[in-house]
Amino acid sequence: MNILAARGVLDVVVNYPLGTFVFGVPLWRNPMELRDLVHYESALINLFCSRISRMTDGVLFDCGADIGIFSSAICARSEAISNVIAFEPNGDAFPFLEKNMAGLPVAAQAFGCAVANFVGTGKLESPGYDRDHTARFLVPGDGPISVTTIDTFRNFGRSIAIKIDVEGGEMEVLRGASETIGSARSCVIAIEAHPQVAGRTGLDPVECLRFLESIRPFQFSVAETGENVSTDRPVLKPGQTQVHNIVCATA
């Protein structure tokens, strides 16, 4: 595998039709066939598209975009989004994200930086339980990674959709988007609820939901089960190992 990577073989891209456009997957990524792409996070994609269905001219912020699968799946399924702003700090994934964003049928930008509640720098580290590049998390401070906030983009007063998959930095992303969220005509946010990440950070995802409620009223639903979530108890149940996605929609 290392020899193939050194020779650039794994940078070869397999192009798949997705809706009216083409989506590219590099060979070095986990093996993915067309059916895997079409059914990627199907419960999350279905609920997210349902929640944004009444939006017009929406802006989608994709935080932790990897190669752009989520944004592309949404744009293939929904006409609610007119602009995508995607972020991926991993230098291996970013060139493929940039190419996939350029192929979307809507205005789209890709930024090779992390998203948090400050503008500055940091570095990516891997947790002991997962060495995959998609599990790396941001450590603020001196480092090669640029960091920005959603509020920096000043998309105030618009219909806003946000996907956050940043391995434990969800609260920081939300704090850095508070003005955007508070001023939005409507807002839909997807947050990953990962038991191992919560164990590392000591923060149950309910804290993110409580923060959103402090800004404005939201409805919270688990994409995989359809369960409505209350903020009077932890999101993650004792002994839970399955990763869930919480879709938060303004009431």
Labelled PLM ranges:
Residues 194-196, 225:
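Active-site beta-loop-alpha junctions enriched in small/polar residues
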Residues 185-194:
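Conserved beta-strand signature within the Rossmann-like core of class I S-adenosyl-L-methionine
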Residues 15, 116, 123-126:
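A conserved beta-strand/loop capping segment in the N-terminal third of enzymes
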Residues 65-69, 91, 115-117, 166-168, ...:
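Short, glycine/acidic-enriched loop or turn micro-motifs at the edges of active sites
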Residues 37-61, 109-110, 118-123, 131-184, ...:
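Short internal loop-to-helix segment that lines adenine-nucleotide cofactor pockets
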Residues 27-29, 128-132:
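Active-site/binding-pocket entry motifs
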Residues 1-100, 104-109, 153-155, 208, ...:
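S-adenosyl-L-methionine
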